[in-house]
């Protein structure tokens, strides 16, 4: 039989399990303290459940049937809100007014949302991750990202966006990841990416791009990854890619490239590019159909006229000895950076480059891009959003940085100083032994 004291303790434990934390917890939800977390995902809610504690910092409402958001649904104390995969059709402009602590907002996979008011995200000064993938958006209003100076990750993929106006991202000075793939963009103007001075990854594949302004990437000096595959591009000027001095991964396949004279500047840039790039398959002219633009020779452009003459093209070809000498002066990704370009030199640039050190040990997978990378803290391509791993392919990113071929200078043998005996070889040892025996014989006589 249980003692009276034990029964009281058991009753208290049972009551504690039934009582909601911090003054209340919504029905069918689970709440956790420190930090206050409300988990209500996958419960077929048609509206925001009542009774969410005002001190809630993390709220998880994904995989329900919620249809709209308005002011008063959440407390300004909120830091994280996941409300993806619902049926949201409307977000009141002042829904997040005063949410100065909000850092992560996932509104993705609400396919009937379609439009957003310009002031929807106004004042979210700490927001660092914003998920708007698969929201049925066909356009973005001017100023919608105004003031989001802390934003680092912006996911806009798999919408129906056809056009982006100049300076749409101009306030996103700390943005590192911009995902725009799977939309209907047909052109990139001069000022679309203006201000994105810290952008690291730009994914534009699987759009309908036909034209890119030659200054579209002007501010992207820190970009390392650019995907333009599976578009409708036929031409891309080499000058367009010239500002991308830190670029490491480039994909241009899946376009109908014209490999005639118009491709010459891109061909020249690709010859200088030191990173990893896809094939650039030629669609025209007919005699080059199926060839890789990168494999064409100087002679293929000899009859082209324009700013760059065949003589200028030929000047880029190097002899074997020249290439070996050039490698001695070309810094690798792990070597010292040019002060003017903290993230590396323009691919193929020669002036101002620093000579690498003589240490011939290899860099082992530095800055490797892998599938096992961390989750929400540093989202990779496979981490668009929680429970979203099945919605894309893993094979679009390389698994490691491209290996570079380098030559180590032949080591100069170090000779012993004058007067110091070196380690003897077999012949020298025999001579020394013979001399010692002769000396011994002479002394015995």
Swiss-Prot record:
GO biological process, one term: negative regulation of axon regeneration
Residue segments, region Disordered: 304-380, 401-421
Family to which this protein belongs: Belongs to the Nogo receptor family.
Compositionally biased spans, kind Basic residues: 352-366, 401-413
PANTHER family: ANTIGEN BSP, PUTATIVE-RELATED (PTHR24369), RETICULON 4 RECEPTOR LIKE 1 (PTHR24369:SF196)
Primary localisation category: membrane
Protein's UniProt name: Reticulon-4 receptor-like 1
Gene Ontology CC: one annotated term: plasma membrane
Role noted for this protein: Cell surface receptor. Plays a functionally redundant role in postnatal brain development and in regulating axon regeneration in the adult central nervous system. Contributes to normal axon migration across the brain midline and normal formation of the corpus callosum. Protects motoneurons against apoptosis; protection against apoptosis is probably mediated by MAG. Plays a role in inhibiting neurite outgrowth and axon regeneration via its binding to neuronal chondroitin sulfate proteoglycans. Binds heparin.
Keyword Signal on entry: yes
Signal peptide feature range: 1-24
The keyword Lipoprotein is annotated on this UniProt entry: yes
InterPro entries xref list: Leu-rich_rpt (IPR001611), Leu-rich_rpt_typical-subtyp (IPR003591), LRR_dom_sf (IPR032675), LRR_TM_domain-containing (IPR050541)
Subcellular location(s) per record: Cell membrane; Membrane raft; Perikaryon; Cell projection
Gene Ontology terms for molecular function: chondroitin sulfate binding; heparin binding; Roundabout binding; signaling receptor activity
Residue span, LRRNT domain: 25-54
Subunit: Identified in a complex that contains RTN4R, RTN4RL1 and NGFR; the interaction depends on the presence of chondroitin sulfate proteoglycans. Does not interact with MAG, OMG and RTN4.
Ranges that cross the membrane: 424-444
LRR repeat spans: 55-76, 77-98, 101-123, 126-147, 150-171, 174-195, 198-219, 222-243
Keywords in alphabetical order: Cell membrane, Cell projection, Glycoprotein, GPI-anchor, Leucine-rich repeat, Lipoprotein, Membrane, Receptor, Repeat, Signal, Transmembrane, Transmembrane helix
Lipidation (GPI-anchor amidated serine): 424
UniProt xrefs under SMART domains: LRR_TYP
Source organism, top-level taxon: Eukaryota
Tissue: Detected in brain (at protein level). Expressed in various regions of the brain, including the cerebral cortex, hippocampus, striatum, thalamus and cerebellum.
Record domain LRRCT: where: 255-306
Annotated source species: Rattus norvegicus
Disulphide connectivity of cysteines: none
């Amino acid at each position: 039989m249980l003692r009276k004291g034990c029964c009281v303790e058991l009753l208290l434990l049972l009551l504690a399990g039934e009582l909601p934390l911090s003054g209340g917890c919504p029905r069918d939800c689970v709440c956790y303290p420190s930090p206050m977390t409300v988990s209500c995902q996958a419960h077929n809610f048609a509206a925001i459940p009542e009774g969410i504690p005002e001190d809630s910092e993390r709220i998880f409402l994904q995989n329900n049937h919620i249809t709209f958001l308005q002011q008063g649904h959440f407390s300004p104390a909120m830091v994280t809100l996941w409300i993806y995969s619902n049926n949201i059709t409307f977000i009141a402009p002042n829904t997040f007014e005063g949410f100065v602590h909000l850092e992560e907002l996932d509104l993705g996979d609400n396919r009937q949302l379609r439009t957003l008011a310009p002031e929807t995200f106004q004042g979210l000064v700490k927001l660092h991750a914003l998920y708007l993938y698969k929201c049925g958006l066909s356009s973005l209003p001017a100023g919608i990202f105004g003031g989001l100076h802390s934003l680092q990750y912006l996911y806009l993929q798999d919408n129906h966006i056809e056009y982006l106006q100049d300076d749409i991202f101009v306030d996103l000075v700390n943005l590192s990841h911009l995902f725009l793939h799977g939309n209907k963009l047909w052109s990139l103007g001069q000022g679309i990416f203006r201000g994105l001075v810290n952008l690291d990854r730009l994914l534009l594949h699987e759009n309908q791009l036909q034209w890119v302004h030659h200054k579209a990437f002007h501010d992207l000096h820190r970009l390392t990854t650019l995907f333009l595959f599976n578009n409708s591009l036929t031409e891309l000027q080499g000058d367009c890619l010239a500002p991308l001095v830190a670029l490491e991964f480039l994909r241009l396949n899946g376009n109908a490239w014209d490999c005639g004279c118009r491709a010459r500047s891109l061909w020249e840039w690709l010859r200088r590019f030191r990173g990893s790039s896809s094939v650039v398959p030629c669609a025209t002219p007919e005699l080059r159909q199926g060839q890789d633009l990168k494999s064409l020779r100087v002679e293929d452009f000899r009859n082209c006229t324009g700013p760059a003459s065949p003589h200028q093209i030929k000047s880029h070809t190097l002899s074997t000895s020249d290439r070996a000498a050039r490698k001695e002066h070309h810094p690798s990704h792990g070597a010292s950076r040019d002060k003017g370009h903290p993230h590396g030199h323009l691919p193929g640039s020669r002036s101002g480059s620093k000579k690498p050190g003589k240490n011939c040990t290899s860099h082992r997978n530095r800055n490797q891009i892998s599938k096992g990378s961390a989750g929400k803290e540093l989202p990779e391509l496979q981490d668009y959003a929680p429970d979203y791993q099945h919605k894309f392919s893993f094979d679009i990113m390389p698994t490691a940085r491209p290996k570079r071929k380098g030559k180590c200078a032949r080591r100069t043998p170090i000779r012993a100083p004058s007067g110091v005996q070196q380690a003897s070889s077999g012949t020298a040892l025999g001579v020394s032994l013979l001399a010692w025996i002769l000396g011994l014989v002479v002394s015995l006589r």
